[in-house]
């Protein structure tokens, strides 16, 4: 088990669940998010419940100086991070042509540039120690045409596959986790209340199962983790589906 895990987007959703499950396994934590109150509350509960050390690092990862602070923490040789979970992200509410282009650029930076910078910092430290794990939270949208969101997640999957092949022999594994629709506050933040996402009930997953299954794949050093059999089947179908059908699949929900 990782001695210390750093998790971005750790105040809610999958990030908060990764923190809970890693704490239950004995990992100390560095929690990164913008909301200090939510981070402090979550950290206090984790310390109280699991008796672990929790460091809170408040940062807006789209602000260069604040991102640099997190990069420095990841690379700090005196306080080694054994697992990096690149989880921070957000969705956009409209079709590409209707979104503000500056919102699209920030979306691209948070989903691609930020994990690339943090991964680069982590690799320098982890390779020097000869061990470490990097977890990039992608999505099944990586395998289905899905505007810029799917394109960003596709980059994460391709990058993680390559990085795992290159660095796993040196003791550092890189895994892209590709959940399907998961019950978190993600959709509400883009204006889709529960029940209005346009997604059949059978396709919804819960965060606890997504994180548990993905951590099992991470521990095995797999380059890609697709939690749940139903989404493994959906991804397999998408690989062989005609382009028109794959595009229609990508129009469901967010």
Language model features with spans:
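C-terminal helical subdomain
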Residues: 176, 197-234
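Residue(s) in the substrate-gating loop at a strand-loop-helix junction
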Residues: 139
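Substrate-binding pocket helix/loop in short-chain dehydrogenase/reductase
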Residues: 95-97, 103-108
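Active-site helix of classical SDR
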Residues: 119, 152-155
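Conserved NAD(P)H cofactor-binding loop of Rossmann-fold oxidoreductase domains
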Residues: 87-92
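Conserved glycine-rich cofactor-binding loop
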Residues: 11-12
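Conserved glycine-rich Rossmann-like NAD(P)H-binding loop of the short-chain dehydrogenase/reductase
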Residues: 25-42
